[in-house]
Amino acid sequence: MNNQLIYTGKAKDIYSTKDENVIRTVYKDQATMLNGARKETIDGKGALNNQISSLIFEKLNMAGVVTHYIEQISKNEQLNKKVDIIPLEVVLRNVTAGSFSKRFGVEEGRVLETPIVEFYYKNDDLNDPFINDEHMKFLGIVNDEEIAYLKGETRRINELLKDWFAQIGLNLIDFKLEFGFDKDGKIILADEFSPDNCRLWDAEGNHMDKDVFRRDLGSLTDVYQVVLEKLIAL
């Protein structure tokens, strides 16, 4: 059915379209942390996230990464291919920061010799726990071949993103990706890529991402606007 709300999340709402294989994603003016324990309405955030993610996904598509992204249709809306989301958050870390630093008792800002890929089980009731390959297979989420693909594709995406952000004076510290199965059963990149789900530091070490909200460092939208303008100029 056309224009029916089929999913509501912390940052986005998903609607059906006339095409059963296409969805309309609406980005919200909402910032959350601690799995939604803290919520705040921030005017203009949805449009910034949508525009940033659209630019990144367009570049990924052109670079040969298969994604769910079709097109941006308004400041806060885009069309995407419908996928069955894999209940995993795939995190890649280039530099120590955030929960990684807390978990292992290391200072933030240490460059990792080899980027680290981590998986988290998408389950709000369980607070998205860390999960390894054996757990994923036990739960029937993905098999060995699919795990290898997720790791390899995430590392490939990282190399592209690191280069693009370096060109605009930003250091890609870490990020979270989500993938899904398309109508043909192929794993493709889904969700979004914005400062909501990555860490970006400028040359002076200033946070250019959602940590501005998490740590009360200033105006989130001002920072996101700077990131958007840099990406447009890329």
From Swiss-Prot:
Gene3D superfamilies: ATP-grasp fold, B domain, Phosphorylase Kinase, domain 1. Pathway: Purine metabolism; IMP biosynthesis via de novo pathway; 5-amino-1-(5-phospho-D-ribosyl)imidazole-4-carboxamide from 5-amino-1-(5-phospho-D-ribosyl)imidazole-4-carboxylate: step 1/2. Its EC number is 6.3.2.6. HAMAP family: SAICAR_synth. One of its GO terms (biological process) is 'de novo' IMP biosynthetic process. Pfam families: SAICAR_synt. One of its GO terms (molecular function) is ATP binding. It catalyses: 5-amino-1-(5-phospho-D-ribosyl)imidazole-4-carboxylate + L-aspartate + ATP = (2S)-2-[5-amino-1-(5-phospho-beta-D-ribosyl)imidazole-4-carboxamido]succinate + ADP + phosphate + 2 H(+). Belongs to the SAICAR synthetase family. Keywords: ATP-binding, Ligase, Nucleotide-binding, Purine biosynthesis. This is Phosphoribosylaminoimidazole-succinocarboxamide synthase.
